[in-house]
């Protein structure tokens, strides 16, 4: 017997669930420094967080939600990206904190587009804010800026007073790092929780991930790991330090241990 999704809405929900699971698997494989997962309560509502390591937004940590259309992925309507806190950016509305995806996609095509494309776009607007507002070059070689964006004030400041824009963004970055530790606004078990580094709690997980040769190569004089890591105050600095330690491993001809993929604690 042939079943149609029109007569069997439960089958449509099952198929939609498989699509969402496939999207989540792609997100895990394709991207770094940005995390997103469907909520436990509803697969059409995703929780996300991005750690920005480069550009004028470096050091920022932003939470956001992705809201998918009811008929995802068949619906041509674009997902809605809403940031949890105010973010100064030309493409983010200062009133409702939504990201404008219209400059990136005209419509959603289920055979071509995936949620990781949206996440990649989020990364790109923070990595290169100025590039995200340019449409090309004039005959004289000057950059042509978009006429309309969600936040025209942010656009004008970025174009006419870049130092002021950077100053405001860096103030915002400090605030974002403080807000990331706020209590979850929901009891959904899939909400992404970020915790400050705590030696007593986290060193045991480091012990599981790093072999004795790693510890020997990365020891800093007589300092305890917690004392040394206490001087690292940003995710970017942590990445830079890890790169330095990897170089030490190679210079000392110590084989690099196989590292398990660390997943965000949910």
Swiss-Prot record:
Residues 15-178 form the UBC core domain. It comes from the Eukaryota. InterPro entries: UBQ-conjugat_E2_core (IPR000608), UBQ-conjugating_enzyme/RWD (IPR016135). CDD domains: UEV_AKTIP. PROSITE patterns: UBC_2 (PS50127). Belongs to the ubiquitin-conjugating enzyme family. FTS subfamily. This is Protein crossbronx-like. SMART domains: UBCc (SM00212). It comes from Drosophila sechellia (Fruit fly). Residues 245-266 have a biased composition (Basic and acidic residues). Residues 226-266 are annotated as: Disordered.
């Amino acid at each position: 017997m042939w079943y149609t999704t029109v007569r069997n809405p439960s089958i449509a929900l099952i198929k939609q669930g498989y699509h969402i699971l496939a999207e989540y698997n792609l997100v895990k494989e394709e991207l770094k420094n940005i995390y997103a997962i469907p909520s436990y309560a509803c697969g059409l509502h995703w929780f996300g967080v991005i750690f920005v390591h480069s550009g004028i937004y470096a050091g920022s940590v932003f939470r956001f939600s992705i809201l998918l259309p009811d008929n995802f992925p068949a619906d041509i309507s674009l997902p809605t990206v809403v940031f949890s806190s105010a973010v100064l950016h030309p493409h983010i509305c200062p009133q409702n904190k939504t990201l404008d995806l219209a400059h990136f996609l005209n419509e959603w095509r289920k055979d071509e587009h995936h949620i990781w494309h949206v996440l990649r776009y989020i990364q790109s607007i923070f990595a290169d804010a100025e590039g995200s507002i340019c449409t090309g070059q004039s005959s004289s070689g000057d950059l042509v800026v978009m006429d309309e964006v969600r936040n025209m004030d942010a656009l004008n400041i970025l174009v006419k007073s870049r130092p002021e824009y950077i100053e405001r963004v860096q103030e915002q970055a400090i605030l974002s790092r403080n807000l990331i530790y706020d209590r979850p606004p929901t009891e959904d078990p899939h909400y992404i929780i970020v915790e400050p580094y705590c030696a007593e709690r986290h060193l045991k997980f480091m012990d599981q991930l790093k072999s004795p040769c790693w510890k020997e190569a990365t020891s800093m004089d007589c300092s305890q790991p917690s004392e040394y890591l206490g001087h690292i105050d940003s995710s970017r600095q942590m990445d830079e330090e890890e790169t330095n330690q990897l170089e030490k491993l190679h210079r000392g001809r110590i084989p690099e241990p196989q590292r398990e993929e660390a997943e965000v604690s949910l």
